[in-house]
Amino acid sequence: MALNLRQKQTECVIRMLNLNQPLNPSGTANEEVYKILIYDRFCQNILSPLTHVKDLRKHGVTLFFLIDKDRQPVHDVPAVYFVQPTESNLQRIIADASRSLYDTFHLNFSSSIPRKFLEELASGTLKSGSVEKVSKVHDQYLEFVTLEDNLFSLAQQSTYVQMNDPSAGEKEINEIIERVASGLFCVLVTLGVVPVIRCPSGGPAEMVASLLDQKLRDHLLSKNNLFTEGGGFMSSFQRPLLCIFDRNFELSVGIQHDFRYRPLVHDVLGLKLNQLKVQGEKGPPKSFELDSSDPFWSANSTLEFPDVAVEIETQLNKYKRDVEEVNKKTGGGSGAEFDGTDLIGNIHTEHLMNTVKSLPELTERKKVIDKHTNIATALLGQIKERSIDAFTKKESDMMMRGGIDRTELMAALKGKGTKMDKLRFAIMYLISTETINQSEVEAVEAALNEAEADTSAFQYVKKIKSLNASFAATSANSASRSNIVDWAEKLYGQSISAVTAGVKNLLSSDQQLAVTRTVEALTEGKPNPEIDSYRFLDPRAPKSSSSGGSHVKGPFREAIVFMIGGGNYVEYGSLQELTQRQLTVKNVIYGATEILNGGELVEQLGLLGKKMGLGGPVASTSLSGGH
């Protein structure tokens, strides 16, 4: 049975809502207890894609509040708290207990609560005489957001900026690495697996992998081993492979335009936590949810947009035919057939029963069709207005050819599109072109200025490419470059060639992404010059024998792929396609520090440009985070 992160996290949440009691086979508690749920903003975002109000009601939650809102006492009712272990949350809990807001307090922290906070909680509740109110304290290890069965985010915003900030010192970098490794640890605890870890040598990926390896080793030696429950999985199947990369491994895929439905909805309509709003011609915006409960989204989110439009039309026509068929059978339309029986005849009664059963299904189908018609209409309007299809094609051609005709380049920059569309296109030109023509670059900059685009991100990529070319030349004989705190090295690490030496070299003939191709090679477990230098870490093996590639045992049927500095729906889709066409790996879970669209990643590049003095003041730039 394949790993399913959404299912595992949902099970943990349900158990928490039922006061951490064992559940019966139906997924509910043996004894129903009505309770109140208190959460912070972060944990609200964890719950949002997993549960709806009806699910909370099913598990006895009658009221739910944000922890930072003023609340009235509700006596004789237990309260379930689900919050991050922060100083402010801790003080609020102590204050709530001292006021006896609720009968009992069941405290659930999204990650492991530090010992000093635990002592502070004990001291605070003792001082106020409310210690008996605290029934239980649990570390839930749920500090991540699951968006689909195989997609998660640590919801750690602006990690790319923080990791690549030229002013960041060793202390700041180590704090970021700690946060990322702790988030990944939560994911592995929830899945109940201890993976084999692979990553490029040098750079953020190796730092996270090494720290995570140590965390897992320490935990496996502790008395309260959280991975014993996963033993059944491990005895039946091979352990999964965890592949860790950082965004600079393949920067282009995070910036480029894409014409497939899921990335397009995320990029153009701002899909967040599986929800989006679409402005119609009249009235307020309509809110929609897109997740695995939507059959059309599940079946068609990987298709190119024109194919989605055709599929919507097909589904609508099928719906109309089915409605007409129902009308015929019930005498509601012309040419109705009653099979020679009267209204109370057995056959017609059966027709009526079948019709009644089919009505809810037809109604639900119509809702789904209407939803995607609204979304597709909004997308089409933006595609036409911004020429997104043209940007997508030109960027793809640039990546394959390693450049673009100057006339075509300038026409795109002076044509339709938002400032951000043109900025992304210009950065893709920089990344994909092996030999930069100075006069051409100046013409691109002039076109961006004419469009009144903030060129900080463009200047940043140009500067780094220039610095990196000389940096690579002076260290060409270096077998390993691992001084992460040096900012230029910190930015590129092992992945220099992936960003600046012509990304077309990393693409196979079918335009397979570099990450996908690398994961495919890693899961096969065969000798391969492209990955032979990758670190191999096995937390279950003796430390002395854990670093060499000779210990790799492939192939791997399960993989977890993690991107530091921001993932995207393009990579996610590519990795899911890998499981469909490749014989080895059957299931891939994809995660990232946050899920970003192209504009959001370029905003982070722009902020780095400003920090390097390549644009306006840093304070003038605000980031709209991913999820």
UniProtKB/Swiss-Prot annotation:
Q: Pfam families from the entry?
A: Sec1 (PF00995)
Q: Which domain of life is it from?
A: Eukaryota
In terms of InterPro entries, this protein maps to: Sec-1-like_dom1, Sec-1-like_dom3a, Sec1-like, Sec1-like_dom2, Sec1-like_sf
In terms of Gene3D superfamilies, this protein maps to: 1.25.40.60, 3.40.50.1910, 3.40.50.2060, Syntaxin Binding Protein 1, Chain A, domain 2
| Region annotation (Disordered) ranges | 526-551
Q: What are its GO biological-process terms?
A: protein transport; vesicle-mediated transport
Q: Where is the composition biased (Basic and acidic residues)?
A: 527-541
Going by the UniProt record, its keywords in alphabetical order are:
Protein transport, Transport
What's one GO-annotated cellular component?
mitochondrion
Record-linked SUPFAM superfamilies: Sec1/munc18-like (SM) proteins (SSF56815)
Function, in words:
May be involved in the early secretory pathway.
Give the family from UniProt.
Belongs to the STXBP/unc-18/SEC1 family.
Q: What is this protein called?
A: SEC1 family transport protein SLY1
Q: Which organism is it from?
A: Arabidopsis thaliana
What taxonomic classification does the UniProt entry list for its organism? Eukaryota, Viridiplantae, Streptophyta, Embryophyta, Tracheophyta
